[in-house]
Amino acid sequence: MTSVTMRQMLEAGVHFGHQTRYWNPKMAPFIFGARSNIHIINLEKTLPLFNDAMKYLEQVAANRGKILFVGTKKTMRKVIEEEARRCGMPYVNHRWLGGMLTNFKTIKASIARMKDLQAMRDDGRLNRFSKKEALGMMRELEKLVCNVGGIGDMDRLPDVMFIIDTGYEKNAVSEARKLGIPVVGVVDTNNSPVGIDYVIPGNDDSIRAVQLYAQSAATAILRGKASGVDFGAVADEFVEMEPETEQGATGETLGG
């Protein structure tokens, strides 16, 4: 399991919440106190919840589940993309389009259009059009890549969503709840933990904190993928063996 220490959380500023006047009373159980009108999050509450969330992501990945990373604030766009790509998961890091999940059929059409334009660009078919038409298509492609590029290989709805700043991404949370998709979410002191399946009480503005969350999630997912057994591949190995070899291998396994 991903191992993060209290010291790492402190160094990343996970404990710094928002100004006390903006607090959400439902976050009271996770608040240690206040300093200079800034709420301080109780990391003794955060750390075990964080570990539970990472363990859950690891288990989902071990079962070949799809985990959608969501973080569209400018400060976190780069790290969301980097870490989602590192663990081979889809991501949304620019703008959450309305109906991205609840109207996934339409989103899939946009993904198909993006791939068509990419193919036309790569094989030279765009050169058959006038410069004006080709420029228009390239602009369309840029917009599509920005909006759906991170979910280009997501052929079905995700099994879980990993969201940093559930308040800012309230539309994503809402769609997940409508569809019954579990949410692992970083919730700061100004937002509500209600409706979040795995709450991570923590700073959602500090880039170091965001890096800690995203890197830990990606690492947990990679560990889960590595631990997952590909039963199909195992079955294929036995099918391809000669009868006497299969018997020997089976006997060796049982004996070992």
Curated annotation (Swiss-Prot):
PROSITE patterns: RIBOSOMAL_S2_1, RIBOSOMAL_S2_2. SUPFAM superfamilies: Ribosomal protein S2 (SSF52313). It comes from the Bacteria. GO terms for molecular function: structural constituent of ribosome. One of its GO terms (cellular component) is cytosolic small ribosomal subunit. Disulfide bonds: none annotated. Gene3D superfamilies: Glucose-6-phosphate isomerase like protein, domain 1 (3.40.50.10490), Helix hairpin bin (1.10.287.610). Keywords: Ribonucleoprotein, Ribosomal protein. GO terms for biological process: translation. Belongs to the universal ribosomal protein uS2 family. This is Small ribosomal subunit protein uS2. It comes from Methylococcus capsulatus (strain ATCC 33009 / NCIMB 11132 / Bath).
